[in-house]
Amino acid sequence: MPRKGHIQKRDVLADPIYNNKTVTKLINNIMLDGKKGTAQKIVYGAFEKVAEKSGKDATEVFEEAMNNVMPVLEVKARRIGGATYQVPIEVRPDRRQALGLRWLTMFSRKRGEKTMVDRLAGEILDAAANTGSAVKRKEDMHKMADANKAFAHYRW
């Protein structure tokens, strides 16, 4: 625990095109080696493809995808009397969003399409339709939490 109190969390600026902080966080997640311009091109290109394929506003589809990807419960290892239990706990809202964005980017990188724009667009569309690898990861996490519900009283 820090002696000087808690560090203030810095707030990200909303992105210039969609005026949305979550989109900025997605850009920061996609970014590799500090190349923000490249990351912006990827995200904005993917959003154009999403709007084109779905016929809806790209930010609406993205928000829907995020809601389908963000986990509500996760398990945390807790050691009690020599045994380690997987204890289900609720996920804080900021961590929920961070995990959702991380999974979206991770699974879009693993997809088979040719360009990252296509991969990200595909993963966003799949997540909005409640399919895709990122949604599967969330469901697996919820299944783990459900299976270990008996240890919920070990929460701290």
UniProtKB/Swiss-Prot annotation:
An MF annotation (GO) of this entry: tRNA binding
GO biological process, one term: translation
Keyword Ribonucleoprotein: yes
An annotated GO cellular component: small ribosomal subunit
Assigned keywords, A-Z: Ribonucleoprotein, Ribosomal protein, RNA-binding, rRNA-binding, tRNA-binding
Protein task: One of the primary rRNA binding proteins, it binds directly to 16S rRNA where it nucleates assembly of the head domain of the 30S subunit. Is located at the subunit interface close to the decoding center, probably blocks exit of the E-site tRNA.
Subunit structure as annotated in this protein's UniProt entry: Part of the 30S ribosomal subunit. Contacts proteins S9 and S11.
Membership in a protein family: Belongs to the universal ribosomal protein uS7 family.
Protein name: Small ribosomal subunit protein uS7
Native source organism of the sequence: Lachnoclostridium phytofermentans (strain ATCC 700394 / DSM 18823 / ISDg)
